[in-house]
Amino acid sequence: EPDLLARLPNFRRRMEWFLSHRPDLAALVSRWQEPGLGERRLLALVRGHRMKRLLRRMLDDTEFLSKYGVRALSKYHEAHPYMLEHEGMRFGVGYVPGESNSGLFGGNSNWRGPIWMPVNYLLVESLYEFHRYYGDDFKVECPTGSGRFLSLREVADEVSRRLCCLFLRGEDGRRAVLGDSPMMQRDPAFRDNVLFYEYFHGDTGQGVGASHQTGWSGLVALLLHPRPAAASCSLSINERMEAHAPGSL
């Protein structure tokens, strides 16, 4: 933000010195000298053209984009595992959307396909922040191959909507997070007492792993509320929660 830079002259001076004296490194990050929407400056590892290439893969529903968020590993690797040979041994990593098929890391945590709320939340917040710099004219196809082009804010809204669908009732009255259990889906004692699972099945959205992971899966509470147009992730979690207090709804 321009007013923030004005309050940090030493930071700006050191930053500009570094960018001018190390052009080899400056060429790898965003163009600091080019102001964006509202004269904002962008300091990021990805430039616009690289972001579009990354999002083309991330927003592909045959790869990372699930009905319920962004997968931790591309679904492409379900049929095409990544293979590595080292010192006569062969290792492979394939897409595993639910419970781990390996005893590594205790066997109950899996980063090879499921949807993880903390990573998805950071993606959503980052997209909102990039939109504050690029504005509505910077668009990407979402989902990839659909012919529908959205601003980064609209992409963030779409990913956020999918994450919320983990917990909200669908048209069939089911909550994806509760899986195929008739008791959890229909019994009044369970169907509305939603648990915050550690991670979620990359295809079905069913809750997996520890079932009381409120420390991060509870972040969906922030996504369920409408986001003000000017909201920034620079607001603390407490400030965001106060803005969503029951008395303010």
PLM segments and residue spans:
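Acidic, mature catalytic/reactive cores of soluble proteins
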Residues: 1-249
